[in-house]
Amino acid sequence: MTNKYESPLSARYASEYMLRLFSADMRIQTWRKLWVSLAKAEMELGLPISAAQVAELEAHIQDIDYACAAQREKEVRHDVMAHVYAYGKAAPCAAGIIHLGATSCYVTDNADIILYRDGLKYLRKELLKVVANLAEFADRHKSMPTLGYTHYQPAQLVTVGKRATLWMQDFLSDLEELDFVIGSMKFLGCRGTTGTEASFLELFGGDTQKIDRMNRMIAVDFAFTQCYPVCGQTYPRKLDSRILNVLSSIAQSCYRMANDIRLLQHDRQIEEPFEKNQIGSSAMAYKRNPMRCERICSLARYLMADALNAPMTASAQWLERTLDDSANRRITMPEGFLCADAILRLSQNVTNGLHVNEKIVEKTVREYLPFIATENLMLEGVKRGGNRQELHEIVRICSMNATAKMKNGEQWDLLADLSSHPEFGMTNAEMEAVLEPTAYIGRCPEQVDSFLARIRHQISDITKSDTEIDL
C-alpha cells in the first residue's frame, strides 16, 4: 500500500500494454518523435536545419528529464513549452529548431490520435478473442436444448449455442463500428495556431506545395494516409466522441452477456470459471458468486457513463479552440481505453472457461417441456378427431392447475392430467413420446452453423492470448 491515490483501472484491471500506451513515457516520446518528424520534413524542404541537429534529436527521444520539465512548467505554466525546454537541454545543438512553426496541438493532438489509433487496434484484437471463444462455445453446444426466456419467464426452447450467437452478434456489430472508426481516423498535421498554416507560409516563402508535402511526410511517418482537410487549432473533438461511443458500445455488449450469465448462474445452468481455492464470501463459505461477470457489469457502467463526457466536450469547442477540453480529456480518454481493455480481458476469461451444467439444463427442460409441448399435443388431438377449441380450453385449465401446484410445492403431472381427458384420444405413453426436446428447438443448430460460417474469416487468424488475466 502507498500513501497516494492510485486509479483502480491501473492498479487492478488494465493490461500492461494499455498502461504503457497511456504512460507519460509513451506520450512524451511520441511528442519527441513528432518534433523529429517535423524537423526532418522541414530540413528536406529546404529550411536551415542540419542533419546533425535531426540526428541529435533522434538520439534523445527516450532520455526524458521529467524533473527538469516539471520545474520549467512551474515557471512558465505551459506543459508543452516545458518539454520543449527539457528536450533542448538534452539536445542543445538542436534546441533552437525544436517546434519550429508549430503550435502545442501539433504534438498534443497528433500524439493523442496516434495513441488512440494504436489503442483501438489493440482492443480490436481483444474483442476478436472474445468472439473466438464464443464461437467455439456456440459450436460445441449448438444442439443442446435449453429453456428460452422472454420477460425472464419460461418461453420456448432454444439451444445453449444459439443463445451464445446472440452475444456474438452484438460483438460483431461493435467490430463493424470499431473498424469504421479506425479506418476513418485522420492525422491533424502541422496547421498552426488557427489551422491557417500562416506560420508555414512565412517559413516556406509562400510555397503552399511545400506545406502540403510537409504534412504528408509527417503523416506517413506515423502510418496515416490522410490529414483533416480543414481544422482549427485542434483536431475535431467529434473524433473523441466517436471513439468513446464505440468503447461504450463494446461495454454494452459485454454487460448484456455478463448479465445473462449472472441470471443463468443463479439457476445453476451456466457458471463462469471458479478457481479451486476461490472464496465466494467472507461469511458464507458455500457461495459461488459470479464475481467476474459482476465486475464486467460494474466497469461497463462506468465506461458507458464516461462516454457521455465526449459529446459535451465536442459541443463546447468555441470557434477555433478553447482549453476547457484539456483537463477533461486527460481523464476521460485514457480511462475509457483502460476500462474497455479491462472489460474485454475479463470477458475473455469468462468466455474461455464458461461451464454448462448439462444435467441442470436438462432438468429445467424436462420440467417445462410438458407446457411447451401442449400446442403439439393439441394439434395431435385434432388429428385424432378432437375439437381444437375444446382441447385448447382443456390445456388452459390443466396448465393453470399444474402451475398452481408448482407454486404450492406440490407434485404435479400435466401429461397425466391431459391424457385423462378422452377428447385428446391419446394415452399418457403416447403423450410422453411427444416430449423429445430436439423437436422443439427449431432451426437452432442450422442457424448456429450458418452464423459461424459467415464469420469464420473474421476470427480465423486470432490466436488465444498467452497471458490470461490473473483474477
Model features per residue range: what roles?
Residues 302-388, 394:
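Long, amphipathic alpha-helical stalk/connector segments used for oligomerization, subunit docking
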Residues 353-421, 441, 446, 453, ...:
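C-terminal alpha-helical interaction appendages
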